[in-house]
Design a protein with these regions (language model features):
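Active-site-proximal helices and loops of the catalytic beta/alpha 8
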Residues: 1-17, 66, 76-171, 175, ...
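N-terminal carbohydrate-binding accessory modules
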Residues: 2-40
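Short, acidic/polar
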Residues: 57-71, 198, 202
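Beta-strand-rich binding/interaction modules
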Residues: 327-346
Length: 371
């Protein structure tokens, strides 16, 4: 508000906003909410979130000073929100992240930088040169589409495109895989409360290549739909009367003791979503193929079944997900018949004989050539 402030230039100002961006420039307001002055400030997301002016070298140095503070505190990495919106130009953004990455790696060569770039993989790919990883929004959207439509026909093609683009940009790239985040309707709401689909989503997440990220509450089946405050409701650790850790900044619309089983109670239920996440996490943690392996398509992929391999040295896994509400029977070829160790299966899943497999509705099967 103060034109004389030394920090005035930390923000973007103009008296003549561009005609095509009038909805992103705002006049400051006084304590009574009345617009003041004739200079507009820029806020890409909202008037409550003015953008920093990183064309100002002083602002860049201020950001570096803050980052250094946290590095010296022992922070191992940063999640970089809206990494494509530093400037309104992708090349300029990438130049900025090259500068920041070099600075941080100079302070701690193992610092990990993950960028949130909500865009198609061809736009995201250049960002994984300065950054260690980016959230894979395309893969997330593909998985959600499969879960909702029960149609996996396009999965192999989409996965191959994503992997190819990212490898060309950075052969050592690390994918960051997720189901939903703080800007999207929650998974359990997207699948209409279907617990079997929520469990399968977890199986998909933990068997795809990359680093799995879990949005808080996803592991206990929290629900929520836009606007943002309703997809960011307080997590339920225990029953409300015995839950001093539960935050109460708002009255939840979707998540309470009647609609969601709190985490502490799910711990004691072997079939709970939380314990399912724990099991899949343990399987992944103990498998080099799932943690580090390459991904390859399988001829078994179809409308009804997501199918892919995870391969690490001599270790070979075949991952099968029946994405439909009906049983599906598959015929294994001679090569797949050699994968005769079951790493994971749903409780009712049955192998009919040596080369026929029946997957239960929303069932997942992981086969391997060794344990």
């Amino acid at each position: 508000k103060n034109p004389e402030s030394v920090m005035r230039s930390y923000f973007n100002w103009t008296e003549k906003p561009p005609a095509n961006e009038m909805d992103k420039w705002y006049l400051p307001k006084d304590e009574k909410g009345k617009a003041i002055g004739n200079a507009y400030y820029y806020g890409y997301f909202s008037p409550e979130m003015p953008d920093w002016n990183y064309d100002n070298p002083q602002m860049v140095e201020e950001a570096k000073r803050i980052l250094k503070f946290y590095i010296e505190m022992g922070v191992d990495g940063f999640r970089l929100d809206a990494a494509q919106h530093i400037f309104n130009d992708h090349n300029k953004n990438i130049g900025f992240w090259n500068l920041i990455s070099a600075y941080l790696k100079g302070l701690n060569k193992t610092v990990f930088l993950v960028g949130e770039v909500d865009n198609s993989f061809d736009v995201v790919a250049p960002y994984i040169k300065p950054l260690d990883a980016c959230f894979d929004f395309d893969l997330s959207r593909e998985v959600l589409k499969i879960l909702k439509t029960e149609d996996a026909a396009t999965f192999t093609n989409q996965m191959e495109k994503i992997v190819s683009h990212y490898k060309k940009a950075n052969s050592n790239y690390k994918d960051v895989i997720f189901l939903t985040n703080h800007d999207q309707n929650r998974l359990m709401s997207e699948v209409k409360g279907n617990l079997a689909k929520a469990k399968q989503a977890c199986c998909i997440l933990f068997t795809l290549p990359g680093i799995p990220y879990i949005y808080y509450g996803e592991e206990i089946g929290m629900k929520g739909e836009k606007p943002d405050e309703f997809i960011r409701e307080p997590i339920l650790f225990g029953p409300e009367k015995n839950d001093p850790m539960r935050t109460r900044w708002m009255k939840p619309q979707y998540n309470n003791d009647k609609s969601i089983t709190p985490a502490f109670l799910q711990v004691n239920d072997d079939q709970s979503l939380l314990n399912h996440y724990s099991r899949m996490n343990a399987i992944r943690k103990n498998s080099n193929a799932l943690r580090f392996g390459e991904v390859a398509s399988s001829a078994l992929n179809s409308k009804n079944v997501m199918a892919y391999y995870r391969i690490y040295n001599q270790q070979r896994y075949l991952i099968l997900h029946n994405v439909t509400a009906s049983p599906v029977t598959l015929t294994l070829d001679d090569k797949d018949r050699l994968l005769n160790h079951i790493i994971y299966q749903n409780s009712k899943q049955t192998i009919v004989n040596a080369n026929l497999i029946t997957l239960e509705p929303y069932g997942t099967l992981i086969l391997a050539n060794d344990r």
